[in-house]
Amino acid sequence: MMKIAAVSMRIKQGRCEENVRQMMRCIEEAKQEGAQLIVFPQNAVSGLQLGEMWLDDDFCRYADSFNARIAALADTIAIVWGNVRYRGSRRFNTAFFAYRGQLELRVKKIDGALENEARYFDPLDIGELIEYGGELIALGFHDQLIPATLNITLDLSDRSISPRGASQLYVNGLSLLEDACGPKLSDGRCFCVRRGRLVHFSEHAQGCHYFDLDGAQTDRPQPVPLFRRMEMLVDALTDERGPFCLWQKHPESLRLARLLQSPELLEEAPMVYGTQNDDPAHPSLFSGFTLPQLIEAGIYDSLEEAGRTRLYADLYRRTRSLRGVCRELISMAGSSPVLQAELSDPQAFVQDLLARMIPLLRAYDELCLSEEYVRYLSDDLQSWLGRQDR
């Protein structure tokens, strides 16, 4: 029976030395706990959202230098981790497997998960299975699963996949990610499914998680409270970005400070974050939370209090299309006579929807919203809504 340590760690962007020190502590702890395999997330050494720093040869050479140091620690334990591999001015987003002088590499396919991914990294087709501890291991990223093997999946994103039938060990990092909408903290999810049985599941929990590969089936635990996730995000931002404050003209800022019992969030600081997902001028601390979650956490008392624009913005973030927004609203209309009445007049409804959404689409998605395209959207949505009534 193989004892495994799955590590969900706070990966700090660009701070290789600090990240590797954290990895070395985990490796030493796992050895003392008698684990045969320890698995770290994707880009555990360097972080992922580094932008143009990926084109800096000196940084990539520096980040790559840590791979040999980590591999040297794989004497009594096999180590899996993710980092850049730099050779001859080529950069490979790589998963590594090391054990007693054996070093195996798997290069992530260019799938667009990272903005400008094809600009920063090179492709390389390596796909042999790895034999270790009586297991055939398929080492990869996201949900590239191979049946009839143990799939070790590395991830470092704000999206994660769910347990499924194949034998799979999935490890995601707790990493701070940020875009035009605002900061998010990836979920740090670790799970292991063995022949259809869930033998481990954890999320939003930093550290080494130990379990036996062929252990007893376990139940998925209760979700981490939303206020705790907000608290973790605030801690991560403070740790990596330094002091910040909340935009006080957003009433939600006052509620969050009160919920977290952190009045210092309302004091003046060099950086300012908003708390409304429909205000492009202030990146929102809530960009990683859905509107129902914000209601559950007590930021809003109801959908009505949150307002129609925030509802539209939330639905668009989930569906990534205006048709998707309309589809969700149609499903909600049965419990909302007001919404039902508005949808009965497609032309007026679409005009209101576009008036609220166009500024957000320009600010967050940087779409080229010409007059011709806006007219197309209006005609398309009205036509689509008309077909739903038939």
For each feature predicted by the language model, list its residue ranges.
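Enzyme catalytic cores with a strong preference for nitrogen-chemistry domains
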Residues: M1-R390
